[in-house]
Design a protein with these regions (language model features):
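A short, N-terminal "cap"/entry segment at the start of jelly-roll beta-barrel domains
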Residues: 1-36, 117
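Conserved short histidine dyad/triad with adjacent acidic residue
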Residues: 40-55, 90
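A short hydrophobic beta-strand segment most commonly corresponding to one strand
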Residues: 41, 60, 87, 102-117
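Short, conserved beta-strand element in jelly-roll/cupin
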Residues: 43-45, 55-70, 109
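A generic "binding-loop/recognition-motif" signal
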Residues: 48, 56-57, 76, 92-93, ...
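Short beta-strand His + acidic residue motifs that chelate non-heme Fe in jelly-roll/DSBH
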Residues: 51-52, 70-71, 88, 94-100
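Short acidic-glycine-tyrosine-enriched beta hairpin
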Residues: 74-90
Length: 117
């Protein structure tokens, strides 16, 4: 078993085209011995957003703090908040935005993309 102290993990700015004011911690990943899944913690600052994008794998999301807008494959926005979870199917376009006044945080669990090759 591997136990990490999440407060000690750095949260660098996401350097992906289309992302703005987003930081991400990798809480559990290959460096921890997890060959199949990766757990990430995203922080979307007020006015920030992830890119509108898709993947060829499914993933699950749990809202940790604050509120945000989950944009679906049709471009429709859905307000989401702490206590909610989302499932994103392979190929679904999606995005997260934060038009609110506090940081929006969520966990995102994905398969290890290297294993999908």
């Amino acid at each position: 078993m591997k136990i990490n102290n999440n407060e000690e993990i750095l949260a660098p700015e996401v350097q992906v085209e289309g992302a703005s004011n987003v930081r991400m911690k990798i809480l559990i990943g290959p460096e921890d011995g997890s060959g199949n899944i990766i757990m990430r913690h995203f922080f979307v600052a007020p006015g920030g957003n992830t890119p509108f994008h898709n993947h060829d794998y499914e993933h699950v999301i749990k809202i940790e703090r604050g509120r945000g807008i989950a944009v679906d494959e049709n471009g429709a926005g859905h307000e989401v908040a702490e206590g909610q979870s989302l499932f994103v199917k392979p190929g679904d376009l999606h995005q997260f935005k934060n038009p609110f006044g506090e940081t929006f945080e969520f966990l995102c669990i994905i398969p290890n993309p290297a294993k999908q090759q």
